[in-house]
Amino acid sequence: IIFNGNNYAPEWAEEAEKRGLPNLRTCADALPHFADKKNIELFERNKVFTEREVRSRMEIMLENYSKVLTIEALTMVEMAKKDIYPAVNEYLSELCSAAQSKEQMGGNTKSDRELIQKLSADNEAMYFAAGEIEKLLVDAKEAVGAEASARFFADKVIPAMQRLRAYADEMELNTAKKYWPFPTYG
């Protein structure tokens, strides 16, 4: 099957449906199909794997998926709480002082106030998004089995990580370079 378009574009989902192909969006969606009956039969017929070996490999891949996402989520939370949050607060402090000085001199501070409010709201939202991820990681330990754990990460943890990332990305655009704690493209 050849598709020379962008497989990440929404058009691909439509094209896959037209061609009768599955559109498995996450590893948690795709990995369980490794042990589909037709795949097991193929592996056994060609003496590659037994059914037990196929299921074992699938289980290992699902466990690895959850473990890698745990590490990524913990890293993200640490970066948000220990690096971004304090850096943006430091920048906010400077912005507030500058706005106050401008106001005392009769200057216009409307843009300063808007930026302060936006950064403050985004920083607070990011902080609470990090807390949400921490709670989800505790909840993830309750998932029974590798497939249930992978499904939990795909359905709950990844969307929470995407929310945190959106706040951090927005703050990166609005924070002075000297305060941002990580290299940027700018």
Which residue stretches match the model-derived regions?
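C-terminal amphipathic alpha-helical interaction region
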Residues: 1-186
